Curated annotation (Swiss-Prot):
Protein name: Putative tRNA methyltransferase MG248
Domain of life where this protein originates: Bacteria
Classification of source organism: Bacteria, Bacillati, Mycoplasmatota, Mycoplasmoidales, Mycoplasmoidaceae
Gene3D superfamilies associated with the record: Vaccinia Virus protein VP39
Localization in the cell: Cytoplasm
Length: 218
């Protein structure tokens, strides 16, 4: 978990934000990491669990720059007049991330996101709804490989090809090919067992098999 959190924090810090919204903050590990390097950073932590937030509040109650809100996504979040701002949604399923960034209350145009599932469906949504994937990386933490994306809202639509939706427009040039292939193999195991695969499922299986086979024979 430490490597995953540190990677997310480094991506957040690369934009030099003054305000961070950690949506679905869970135990506020990201807040703990961020304030070590920037005590002046304003951080809004939100979660649907009141009990989790109460526990987190006790850790940070003496820091006036750290705030806590019980909220399902943006439903109960205030838009603070501090810029630049960035949102983080980490450790939630891809479909839940889609739900959150689609909310009409969403006022953030840049996010670091780390989906636990439905990565390809998430990329497809981003492509169809004018969100640009400006960065994507993989982090291996113990036996798990986590995809982490930086996305920004575009003014004009920009659609990815099906192949790039499946493979990731930034991941195809990922330097650690062994880690990348392990990631693709994990994705393949999600789609292969389906009894009634859709046309998109079949395209995903074909594309992943093709690139994995190419890597293994090289």
């Amino acid at each position: 978990m430490k490597k995953r959190i540190s990677t997310i924090a480094n991506l957040v810090q690369s934009f030099n934000p003054k305000l961070v919204y950690d949506i679905g903050c869970d135990h506020s590990y990201l807040t703990s990491y961020l304030i070590k390097t920037n005590q002046n950073l304003t951080i809004v932590n939100s979660d649907i669990s009141k009990n989790a937030l109460l526990s987190n509040y006790q850790k940070f109650k003496n820091n006036n720059n750290i705030h806590f809100f019980v909220s399902d996504g943006f439903n109960n979040l205030p838009e603070l007049n501090i810029n630049p701002k960035i949102g983080v949604i980490a450790g939630l399923g891809g479909l839940k991330i889609i739900n959150i960034i689609s909310q009409k209350e969403n006022f953030i145009n840049r996010f670091v996101i780390q989906p636990q599932s439905n990565l390809i469906e998430l990329r497809s949504f981003l492509s169809l709804n004018s969100w640009d994937i400006v960065n994507e990386t993989l982090v291996q933490d113990r036996e798990f490989i986590y995809p982490i994306l930086v996305i920004e809202k575009l003014k004009k639509p920009f659609k990815l090809t099906k192949e790039l939706v499946i493979l990731g427009p930034k991941l195809i040039n990922f330097k650690d090919k062994h880690c990348l292939m392990k990631h693709y193999q994990c994705l393949l195991r999600v789609y292969q067992p389906k009894q009634k695969p859709s046309l998109m499922d079949l395209k995903i299986i074909e594309t992943l098999n093709k690139i994995i086979t190419s890597y293994e024979s090289s």
